[in-house]
A protein has these predicted regions:
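Non-transmembrane, aqueous-exposed alpha-helical and coiled segments at domain scale
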Residues: 1-433
């Protein structure tokens, strides 16, 4: 069975939480796009883990994890991440982690270039809100054919690879010197860096497409793990305030390495309220007062897992979520962090937008989203700790009414509701996987 777990909104919906649960019965968990520019948080009996590159399934020793062809991989960051979780007793070796030979390497200059450009824009008051992880530059060079793939590390002594390195470095030094007045990098230093990475990661690099296809054909349970959410998709998100990859479920088999396989299920993950990291239109943050937003931010611990930046927050946005559901084509929905709302007497929900006093019929990522005004409906809250609830019937009637209101607005049943960060704190409503 092939299942994709995707974000419906701007990311940070709690996908890692859901994937960790599904990994209990999975054979393989594979990342299919993005890099280390976002983090999945998983809480286990060993404590809290923040994973930027490693799939959330790495915390299950019987699961094989894959970094797929659609990713851009900062190998220095991956090395540090592996060291960090191994120090906490998590096994990582070529048996349970496989890296696609077709994945793009995030080269040393990509983060440098990202930071320099963000600083240049900031001086003009036009900062983009980049994570400075070099993601856009790695993807840009991928499509310009001006970078290496992981498989090239296995052939560094071949003339064709060394010639490509010369061509790539010549082009990059021209860019960095001409645009940012940086000193050129040497070929010898670059080749040495590549050899160092090959020395560590060569045993992990393989044709993951063949591995995944064999697993799929033999009936293994495969979970494909997305990064970020629909609003950050390069094609269907709020352009240009997007990531540089395709975050949608339709891309999952392709980015993982099995373009000839069809998804059986798509799990769309929603948070019980709205959050966003980075620049761009985000109507939800204008629905309530900044004091209300700050209280929600503190209650939910809403700070970026990869960057530590305070997340922009607001009420649940039904308009944006309907669009995200359409993009992802989800047949299962997981709602996370319902417990964060437990202290509120009333809970706001965004049920519409207006623009210049006229109701906006639907969410359009290319329209004047920075000018829309949210229409808010207030629902009764519940003054009860729900973290101990183990079934739908145990939830307060107001909490159940809140979830059912969202279902009606979205036109889709919600099957999974998390009531706390820990693995066991969730309730099921309807048929789950």
């Amino acid at each position: 069975m092939l299942t994709a777990v995707t974000g419906i909104n701007w990311g940070d919906e709690g996908k890692g939480r859901v994937i960790d649960l599904l990994a209990e019965n999975a054979d393989v968990v594979a990342r299919y796009q993005g890099g280390d520019n976002a983090g999945h948080t998983v809480v286990t009996e060993q404590g809290k883990f923040i994973l930027n590159l490693l799939p959330s399934g790495i915390l299950h020793p019987e699961v094989t994890c894959v970094l797929g062809a659609g990713m851009v991989i900062d190998l220095d960051h991956l090395s540090r991440e592996i060291d960090a979780i191994e120090e906490r007793g998590v096994k990582v070796d070529p048996e349970n982690l496989k890296l696609s030979d077709k994945a793009t390497i995030s080269m040393p200059w990509h983060k440098v270039q990202d930071g320099l450009e963000e600083d240049r824009l900031a001086q003009k008051g036009r900062a983009f809100g980049s994570t400075r992880r070099g993601i856009a530059y790695a993807y840009s060079d991928k499509y310009r054919k001006k970078t290496l793939r992981l498989g090239d590390l296995l052939h560094l002594d071949e003339e064709r690879v060394q010639n490509r390195l010369h061509v790539i470095l010549e082009s990059k030094n021209l860019e960095l010197a001409g645009c940012y007045h940086q000193e050129p990098m040497s070929y010898d230093a670059l080749l040495e860096w590549c050899r160092m990475q090959a020395g560590q990661f060569a045993p992990y690099i393989c044709d993951v497409g063949a591995f995944l296809k064999q697993a799929h054909d033999s009936g293994k349970r495969i979970v494909l793990e997305a990064q970020l959410g629909a609003m950050r998709d390069i094609d269907y998100g709020i352009f240009p305030f997007t990531s540089s990859s395709n975050t949608l479920a339709a891309y999952a088999p392709l980015g993982a390495g099995i373009p000839n396989c069809r998804l059986d299920h798509v799990v769309g993950v929603l948070k019980a309220y709205s959050t966003c990291v980075g620049a761009g239109p985000f109507a939800a943050e204008n629905a309530m007062s900044e004091d209300w937003n700050e209280q929600l931010r503190k209650a939910g611990g809403e700070y970026g897992a990869a960057t530590g930046r305070p997340r922009r927050v607001g009420p649940f946005d039904c308009v944006a979520s309907r669009y995200g559901l359409t993009c992802q084509g989800a047949d299962k929905i997981a709602l996370t962090k319902l417990d964060v709302l437990s202290s509120m007497k009333e809970i706001p929900v965004i049920t519409g937008y207006t623009l210049d006093g006229v109701q906006v019929p639907s969410f359009d990522p290319l329209s004047d989203l920075d000018r829309v005004k949210p229409v808010v409906t207030m629902l009764p809250g519940w003054n009860k700790d729900i973290s101990g609830c183990k079934s739908w019937d145990e939830l307060p009637k107001e909490a159940k009414a809140y979830v059912e209101f969202l279902e009606k607005q979205l036109g889709h049943e919600i099957q999974f509701v998390s009531t706390g960060a820990e693995r066991e704190k969730f309730v099921l409503k309807g048929e789950w996987l």
